[in-house]
UniProtKB/Swiss-Prot annotation:
UniProt main location, coarse: membrane
Lineage of source species: Eukaryota, Metazoa, Chordata, Craniata, Vertebrata
InterPro entries named in the record: DnaJ_C_subfamily_member5, DnaJ_domain, DnaJ_domain_CS, J_dom_sf
Extent of Polar residues compositional bias: 161-171
Protein name from the UniProt record: DnaJ homolog subfamily C member 5G
Tissues showing expression: Testis specific.
Annotated source species: Homo sapiens
CDD domains noted in UniProt: DnaJ (cd06257)
Topology with respect to the bilayer: Lipid-anchor
GO (cellular component) term, any one: membrane
Length: 189
């Protein structure tokens, strides 16, 4: 790992950038991809799934290296790198955001990648915090309870209100007392 920027653009298991896997420079043209990953003269136009005619893939193909697990892994990395870097959209995302961008592209699409990196950018987080503080959104409950409609009554007034509501207290002894008067009890039936 020579630089942090290279570390951000890793996708292969061997911790090499996809350009290094294909032995290409970052600004390589599509013709360079064809040269690096070209077909043999025997099959000028093989089907899409056909990988045996490609120079780089032939070196590490599992059929050419039987029993070599490392060659099979390198072959898989070469095919994955070619699939990503030959697609212009995936290549652009890989150049901008690295392997995380490719992972997000595979799961959420191109729009998902854009929104993810916008929402995780430092300037967006700063903007959200600034707007929240300026509009008192995060202090909504505090503002409503302190000075808004849900403001509790002051201590002095609340004591008087409770004293006015209590007219008499029930007896404290264990004696049972009928709180209804006799006049009301006869009228109720």
């Amino acid at each position: 790992m020579s630089t942090v920027k290279e570390a951000a653009h890793r996708l292969s298991k061997s911790e090499m950038s996809l350009y290094a896997v294909l032995d290409l420079k970052k600004g390589a043209s599509p013709e360079d991809f064809k040269k690096s990953y070209s077909h043999s003269a025997l099959l000028p136009h093989p089907p899409f799934e056909y990988h045996l005619g490609r120079k780089l893939a032939l070196r590490y193909h599992p059929d050419k290296n039987p029993g070599n697990a490392q060659a099979a892994e390198i072959f898989k990395e070469i095919n994955a790198a070619h699939a990503i870097l030959s697609d212009s959209k995936k290549r652009k995302i890989y150049d901008q955001h690295g392997s995380l961008g490719i992972y997000l592209y595979d799961h959420f699409g191109e729009e998902g990648v854009r929104y993810y990196f916008i929402l995780n950018s430092c300037w967006f987080k700063t903007l959200v915090i600034l707007c929240t503080l300026l509009t008192c959104c995060c202090f909504c409950c505090c503002c409503c309870f302190c000075c808004g409609a849900l403001k509790p009554p002051p201590e002095q007034d609340s004591g008087r209100k409770y004293q006015q509501n209590v007219q008499s207290q029930p007896p404290r002894s264990g004696a049972k007392c009928d709180f209804r008067s006799e006049e009301n009890s006869e009228d109720d039936f």
